Amino acid sequence: MGQKVNPHGFRLGITTEFSSRWYADRMYRDYVKEDVAIRRMMTRGMERAGISRVEIERTRDRVRVDIHTARPGIVIGRRGAEADRIRADLEKLTNKQVQLNILEVKNPEIDAQLVAQGVAEQLSQRVSFRRAMRKALQSALKAGAKGVRVQVAGRLGGAEMSRTEFYREGRVPLHTLRADIDYGFYEARTTFGRIGVKVWIYKGDVVAGRDHEAARVAARVQQRAVRGRSARREQPAAESPALETAAPAVAEPGAAAAPAAAGADVPVVADTAPAGQGAAERPVAEQPVVTAEPAAAAAVTGETGTGGSNAAPAEPTTSAAAEEAPGGADAPSDATETKEG
């Protein structure tokens, strides 16, 4: 199928674009006829200008015509006289305001339409078709084309029987949709009849359509990931003052080392006493435990009730008395002496 179909229409929307860009409902037929008439006017009146293609874009009250040519000076004319004439003819044909843009083809040696037109002009001047084809091949390959195929058909050399001959150099993958293949056709008028010239030029593969969209989406995702990483790097720096203010509330180094060494989770009880009267936080396992007999406990309670809050230094004496109480029979007398004193 790729050998027979027009390469431009076969790859439309993949590597090639529409030559006419407009939308119409009822006027569709009239617009198509106008486009054909515009292109016919450009090709017939200016064969020497080397026009490659004509792009047409329509709006409600304006028509934009882009002319791609290898010789813009011929299209513009002296002081723009030729361009003004073309614009006037187009406005008369379309009955609308016409915006005319003349664009230069940077590399005409690899433009298929211009190459076909050049070969046809040489055939019209009775140049050998083989020489014209080989010259076109060499110039296109030197200009950077990866593959070229030139085909001529008709009464070649004035023969009574028409035939088709072609020359090819490099790769011309007509079945590959991603291949950027330019196609051109032109007819040479000779004394023996018309000779058709077709040119295929392979310029390389083009990433388009879904592949291009997937690459664009991947780039957006990568940008978002980079932004997220930068935000994460800036977040600890913003929270560092809060960590510094909470640092004084951490337990003492000796107290914090014991639970970590034991390997168990020890609940921490926060001290609600005012500052200066106790530790801020202390593990439950390290809280002082007072073990005393009922009598000693009553004595301590009595002293605490009479002494008030200043009786806190008496805890070491009470704990010492509690440790000596189970030792012998003199424990009650010691407790009595302590109470009398």
Curated annotation (Swiss-Prot):
Task: List, alphabetically, the InterPro entries matched.
Answer: KH_dom, KH_dom-like_a/b, KH_dom_type_2, KH_sf_prok-type, Ribosomal_S3_C_sf, Ribosomal_uS3_bac-typ, Ribosomal_uS3_C, Ribosomal_uS3_CS
Q: Where is this region: Disordered?
A: 224-246, 274-341
Cite the KH type-2 domain residue spans from the record.
38-106
What SUPFAM superfamilies does this protein's entry cite?
Answer: Prokaryotic type KH domain (KH-domain type II), Ribosomal protein S3 C-terminal domain
Might you name a Gene Ontology BP term for this protein?
translation
Q: Which GO terms describe its molecular function?
A: mRNA binding; rRNA binding; structural constituent of ribosome
Extract one GO cellular component term from the record.
cytosolic small ribosomal subunit
Q: Where is the composition biased (Low complexity)?
A: 285-303, 311-333
Q: Which residues cross the membrane?
A: none
Which keywords does this Swiss-Prot/TrEMBL entry list? Ribonucleoprotein, Ribosomal protein, RNA-binding, rRNA-binding
Pfam family of the protein (one): KH_2
The similarity annotation says: Belongs to the universal ribosomal protein uS3 family.
Q: Which HAMAP family match?
A: Ribosomal_uS3_B (MF_01309_B)
**What is the documented function of this protein?**
Binds the lower part of the 30S subunit head. Binds mRNA in the 70S ribosome, positioning it for translation.
Subunit comment for this entry? Answer: Part of the 30S ribosomal subunit. Forms a tight complex with proteins S10 and S14.
What name does this protein carry? Small ribosomal subunit protein uS3
